[in-house]
UniProtKB/Swiss-Prot annotation:
Binding-site positions, ATP: 151, 153-155
Source organism of this protein record: Clostridium botulinum (strain Langeland / NCTC 10281 / Type F)
Keyword list, A-Z: ATP-binding, Cytoplasm, DNA replication, DNA-binding, Lipid-binding, Nucleotide-binding
Keyword Zinc: no
Protein name, UniProt field: Chromosomal replication initiator protein DnaA
């Protein structure tokens, strides 16, 4: 970075500082780093897309005017989302030692690395297993199966494994794909008669990372193709990493031959973060995004938001935005006001049959209409009985009302469902785990 650019920018932000409140300046302007100044174009590095959006909509004209006051020129401002590390490399004209092709770089999120992952009691085992696999692909645990609820860090760990392997061996062929994308590509390959290309893409590689594998349940052709892909990679001593929202034995309508293969290696779960981990996550986020958040505010967030990492980080950003837009200092009172809709809805929302039907349908990869339909196939009838059981346990609705909500069924059908699930729970461990998971998801709604 040239001395001229540095001096010009420092003078500009001194002018801008006089036009803003301290909280607005520290939150939005202080985090900017100048990258380059060419002709009438100034490139400025910002830490994230959220900051970029705020700067473009609220502060861009202020920056342009400050520079015009200094130089008598009107500059075009271009905000670039990047990190300090990337800025430094650009300044020094250094080449990255990680060599990946364009397709690879778009598959792995640069933010999801082991360094940015916050370790706590809830995820320590999954993190250790992921690092072991990254250090010794196909030698430590193969496959590695990571499961846990939404927003707990499964995808983060999978991307971190990919980055780590590419850093140590840039020539490795690493492919990250969601099960939905895998299915769509398979369908297109059949339609376009490109089966060979599809198989080459997923079988002639070193590392396969498949996210949300539970969505292939019930898709016979996809399961068939993935079975052969799994076998080809495993027999060639290539690493397979899989994520899901539940363990293999609880994925409904998954073929037994796939289920058993998923259990060949190591199964690691991620739980909701405890208070200490939630605090660490918030501090890490504030540090990365260069946000000045009082400790008591982070304690407030960590106490009120308990379900997952995404909601924690979302609450933090919401508070910062609320502070900037209202020109108020960040405090517990402001945090309470900013999050009142989120917190009150979590604290007061009652469990309803609609919520139960939504959660059960999602868990078993069904539509809510299936639970209300007249269809009696086991893959629908059993989840329907579970939903009726939970409706009886978790709501104050009468038996006739519950029956009515499930396609106008008689109250005796509800009684039968309740008794059947109650009896099965006494002897079926997998059902016990399913009910436990469903209860947790219902409570998080």
């Amino acid at each position: 970075m040239s001395t001229h650019l540095t001096e010009t920018w420092e003078k500009a932000i001194n002018i801008i500082k006089g036009e803003l409140t301290e909280v607005s300046f520290n939150t939005w302007i202080k985090s900017i780093n100048p990258i380059s100044l060419e002709n009438n174009s100034l490139k400025l590095a910002v830490p994230n897309d959220f900051t970029k959006g705020i700067l473009e909509s609220r502060y861009k004209d202020l920056i342009v005017n400050a520079l015009k006051l200094l130089t008598s020129k009107k500059y075009n401002i271009d905000f670039i989302v990047t990190t300090e590390e990337k800025i430094e490399k650009n300044h020094n004209n250094e080449k990255s030692n990680i060599v990946v092709n364009d397709e690879m770089s778009t598959m792995l999120n640069p933010k999801y690395t082991f360094d940015s992952f916050v370790i706590g009691n809830s995820n320590r085992f999954a993190h250790a297993a992921s690092l072991a696999v990254a250090e010794s692909p196909a030698k430590a645990y193969n496959p590695l199966f990571i499961y846990g609820g939404v927003g707990l860090g499964k995808t983060h760990l999978m991307h971190a494994i990919g980055h780590y392997i590419l850093h140590n061996n840039p020539k490795s062929q690493v492919v990250y794909v969601s099960s939905e994308k895998f299915t769509n590509e398979l369908i297109n390959s059949i339609k376009d008669d490109k089966n060979v290309e599809f198989r080459n893409k997923y079988r002639n590689i070193d590392i396969l990372l498949v996210d949300d594998i539970q969505f292939i349940a019930g898709k016979e052709r996809t399961q068939e193709e993935f079975f052969h892909t799994f076998n080809a990679l495993y027999e060639a001593n290539k690493q397979i990493i899989i994520s899901s929202d539940r363990p293999p034995k609880e994925i409904p309508t998954l073929e037994d031959r796939l289920r058993s293969r998923f259990e060949w290696g190591l199964i690691a779960d991620i739980q909701a973060p405890d208070f200490e981990t939630r605090m660490a996550i918030l501090k890490k986020k504030a540090d990365v995004e260069k946000l000045n958040i009082p400790n008591e505010v982070m304690v407030y967030i960590a106490t009120k938001i308990k379900s997952n990492i995404r909601e924690l980080e979302g609450a933090l950003i919401r508070i910062v935005a609320f502070s900037s837009l209202t020109n108020k200092e960040i405090s517990v009172d402001l945090a309470s006001e900013a999050l009142k809709d989120i917190i009150s809805s979590k604290q007061t929302r009652q469990v309803t049959i609609d919520i139960i039907q939504e959660v059960v349908a999602n868990y078993y990869n069904l539509k809510i209409e299936d639970l209300k339909s007249a269809r009696r196939t086991r893959n629908i009838a059993f989840p329907r009985q579970i939903a009726m059981y939970l409706s009886r346990k978790l709501t104050d609705m009468s038996l006739p009302k519950i029956g009515e909500e499930f396609g106008g069924r008689d109250h005796t059908t509800v009684i039968h469902a309740y008794e059947k699930i109650s009896n099965n729970l006494k002897k079926d461990e997998s059902l016990q785990n399913a009910i436990k998971e469903l209860n947790k998801r219902i409570n998080q709604k």
